[in-house]
């Protein structure tokens, strides 16, 4: 049974926390169950924190709960220390940390709701997929 290694865009994490319906939430459950490996860098963890703290009211969580969630993700994740040698590839600079992490950590997948933003990363052999497509892949592999 393959254990896929994936980078999760912030929009997937947010969607999974916003609603218990849908593939994003199911992916978070399968992550906790050890069915796939989240790849994480300091930059991506910081992005997660910024978005979750900014959206805490919408998500219905306190800053303390946000901190606990991020701590849990860090424990579950495979941490990557990235080089400073990265040439921007993407039209949106906010997406670069995810592309950098996926490329340098040799991720199997980059999971996002914005596939078209990551088109250049596909040329590096990274499969850029929706949460639903990744969920189907993880379920088929377990």
What role is predicted for each listed range?
Residues 17-18, 52, 122, 139:
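Short, flexible helix/strand-to-coil boundary loops that buttress conserved ligand/catalytic motifs
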């Amino acid at each position: 049974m393959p254990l896929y290694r994936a980078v999760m865009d912030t929009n997937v994490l947010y969607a999974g926390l916003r609603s218990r319906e849908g593939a994003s939430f199911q992916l978070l459950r399968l992550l906790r169950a050890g069915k796939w490996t989240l790849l994480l860098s300091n930059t991506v963890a910081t992005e997660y924190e910024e978005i979750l703290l900014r959206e805490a009211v919408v998500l219905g969580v306190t800053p303390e709960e946000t901190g606990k969630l991020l701590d849990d993700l860090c424990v579950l994740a495979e941490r990557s220390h990235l080089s400073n040698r990265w040439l921007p590839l993407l039209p949106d600079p906010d997406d670069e940390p995810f592309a950098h992490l996926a490329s340098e950590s040799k991720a199997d997948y980059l999971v996002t709701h914005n596939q078209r933003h990551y088109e250049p990363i596909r040329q590096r052999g990274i499969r850029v997929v929706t949460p639903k497509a990744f969920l189907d892949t993880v379920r088929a592999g377990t």
